[in-house]
C-alpha cells in the first residue's frame, strides 16, 4: 500500500488548487515560488505568469487541508504576508479555486 493512501485514509484531507497573484519589490518569481512551497499545506507551486515591469507574479498553488477551501487559502495568505518580508501582496483568485481528486477517487 502506498504511503499516500495510508495517510489519506487516516485523516480526511482535501486537495485544492488556485491561482495566486503575488507582488514583490525584492524577490524573483523563482524565489517567491520557493517561499510559497515552504508554507504549511502547500504541495506544489508553479509559476504561471510573471510581469517584471509591475513586479506581479501569478502562481498555480496546490494545497492539502482539512479546512474549507476559503479558510485554507485565507490562512495561506496570512502566513505568506506575516512570514515573508519579500511578499507585499498575496491575492487568491476565488473563482479559480477548485477541489482536486484524492488518490482514492481516481
Segments predicted by a language model, with ranges:
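Short, low-order "capping/linker" segments at domain edges
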Residues: 57, 61-62, 66, 96-106
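Short, flexible N-terminal segments of the mature chain
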Residues: 29-51
